[in-house]
Amino acid sequence: MKYLRNDLREEYERIAKNVPDIEDLQHPLINFSDVLHAYFILADYFTDESSDNIEHMLVGLRSADLLGSALGRQIVSFGGRKKYTDSIEICATLFYGLVKDHAFHDGNKRTALLICTRFSGHWLKNE
């Protein structure tokens, strides 16, 4: 977050201060801080004012509860049995939750894709 524009850094710090991580979501699972990092990196890229091709992205968290709901999908269980145990299944349900819950004003699908490719270790390669 070191190289973010000042306005984005202030918004990131404001949100990060008010939205704590969930204790049950430890590495390798994705937490609030991981998603916020990815979101603000994308926000910085897609609102770059030095470029001729500026995209007008609405920056900000719409609902911390919706983001928590999407993140909580990773640890869903019933009767002591976790619903998702395979890393691909966990990544898929997280992707679905981030896309469908619309926790951010804009950039939900981009954030979901970045999170899943980065943290699953499956980077796309040009071939």
Annotated model-derived regions:
Residues 1-127:
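FIC/Doc superfamily catalytic core
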